[in-house]
């Protein structure tokens, strides 16, 4: 399967009916600013957090720790410390910190959704 290049994937903010602080509104502003400029240069895709949780963990009730565990199980099964390893024996996720885990989760979600979409497209009508 060949992918069309996607240069940027951005996690979108969604409303769940709860009160939010100024940080959320600032994040929305920055998403808009980045999107406006990046769309001039690249294909931009958007992912919601609930889609990350569902795609990676199979549940919308997942949290950051659950997502990290699922990613470690998928990409670094059996490696200690969520696949980070140690300085002398670095693992797949060596050097990952909070925001890097989140960015990786966004990228993997986009990849998996794109794979799913393309497979559905490819086999549309097969077996009907």
Residue positions per predicted region:
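Phosphate- and other anionic-substrate recognition elements at nucleic-acid/protein interfaces
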Residues: 1-128
């Amino acid at each position: 399967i060949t992918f069309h290049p996607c240069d940027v994937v951005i996690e979108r903010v969604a409303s769940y009916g709860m009160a939010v602080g100024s940080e959320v509104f600032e994040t929305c502003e920055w998403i808009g600013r980045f999107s406006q400029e990046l769309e001039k240069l690249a294909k931009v895709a958007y992912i919601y957090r609930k889609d990350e949780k569902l795609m990676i963990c199979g549940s919308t009730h997942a949290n950051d720790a659950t997502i990290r565990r699922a990613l470690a199980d998928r990409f670094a099964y059996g490696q200690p410390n969520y696949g980070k390893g140690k300085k002398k024996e670095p693992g797949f996720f060596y050097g990952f910190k909070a925001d890097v885990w989140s960015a990786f989760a966004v990228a993997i979600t986009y990849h998996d959704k794109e794979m799913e979409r393309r497979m559905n497209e490819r086999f549309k009508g097969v077996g009907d």
